[in-house]
């Protein structure tokens, strides 16, 4: 089964908790804190695999989770990093955050990887909080939650040439004759409901990849007849072979069909209208077809080269394929997109904004939200340490400037507190 779209939920591993421990050794009367840090959570990574042709593996499972980092231990022993989760996708997969059109990654090279969800940092053990005025801290940080999000995966086939045209125009017969691809072929419309790829060998060491795109209908650019699903696979091609049934069967007009498909291509993406296109006037072995082929050539008006072929008998295919290859030689291959590197910068805890929402004051800032999420709010000493940080970086002053009063609510990330005057403020 071919599947070119998937929506999945990924969750990176949470960081392990830091440890609260103290040295207890003979002849060491004041051992001091020795709690180690928790391990980082595992990342979720997408890896392009040239052996895959579809996103069908994501059809029955939508939730994926990486491993959690282990907790720190005494004697300054740090926790192990959580196991990364690597999900294999076909080459040509585009990755977006669900509901956001912004491209996160375009995996066009075999083996290319992109981290879609970062594992949470391990919490610091109490040994990291020792200071001149805090010789025996009895608190540690919790592990940071791993990133989680919904992703949309969209596969756009990587082919040099795309076969386009109305259903039953003969595209599948062509690809079966010129390559080893074996799509389903029958004498009725919409026999092909999924794209097929085939390698066309022209000579020694000379070949190109041909894609058989399922038949388009009028309104395809608006999604009619699964048009959006099919048209996306044309986007990466460098040359189009427009297959037109010139037999005139069932009362169809080859010239009208030819013009209708070109309108759909232009309406979907104007760049497709400017893409080099060869026209294959197919089924010339049938009565009256050659007259229609000549009418089609006149309608093309020198804009396109028209080749009279019969995919069934093979007549004219060699000439069409040879011309396609020579045309490809004149069109440069687009360079692979530069890899998108996830932002690894440390978030500055001093960068925050304070806003009022009714009776609640909201403090926003990735750095401070992370610190709160990693604080053990059940430990009074850890809470005091957090309060000292909020005073030191100016959060309390900013809240006062907004008019906060004792008893008002403060929200930082997922956590909400009741404000009280800091006795040291």
Curated annotation (Swiss-Prot):
Entry-linked Pfam families: DUF1967, GTP1_OBG, MMR_HSR1
E.C. number: 3.6.5.-
Function description: An essential GTPase which binds GTP, GDP and possibly (p)ppGpp with moderate affinity, with high nucleotide exchange rates and a fairly low GTP hydrolysis rate. Plays a role in control of the cell cycle, stress response, ribosome biogenesis and in those bacteria that undergo differentiation, in morphogenesis control.
Membrane-spanning ranges: none
Main location: cytoplasm
Keyword Nucleotide-binding among record annotations: yes
Subunit structure: Monomer.
Known cofactor(s): Mg(2+)
Gene name of this polypeptide: obg
Domain of life: Bacteria
Domain OBG-type G: start-end pairs: 159-329
InterPro entries tied to this protein: G_OBG, GTP-bd, GTP-bd_Obg/CgtA, GTP-bd_prot_GTP1/OBG_C_sf, GTP1-OBG_CS, GTP1_OBG_dom, GTP1_OBG_dom_sf, OBG_GTPase
This protein's UniProt keywords: Cytoplasm, GTP-binding, Hydrolase, Magnesium, Metal-binding, Nucleotide-binding
GO molecular function, one term: GTPase activity
Protein's recorded name: GTPase Obg
Domain Obg: 1-158
Any one GO BP annotation for this protein: ribosome biogenesis
Hydrolase recorded as keyword: yes
Enzyme class: hydrolase
Protein source organism: Desulforudis audaxviator (strain MP104C)
A single GO cellular-component term on record: cytoplasm
NCBIfam families: Obg_CgtA, Obg_CgtA_exten, PRK12296.1, PRK12297.1, PRK12299.1
Residues binding GTP, per UniProt: 165-172, 190-194, 212-215, 282-285, 310-312
Location(s) in or outside the cell: Cytoplasm
Annotated OCT domain residues: 341-421
Binding site for Mg(2+): 172, 192
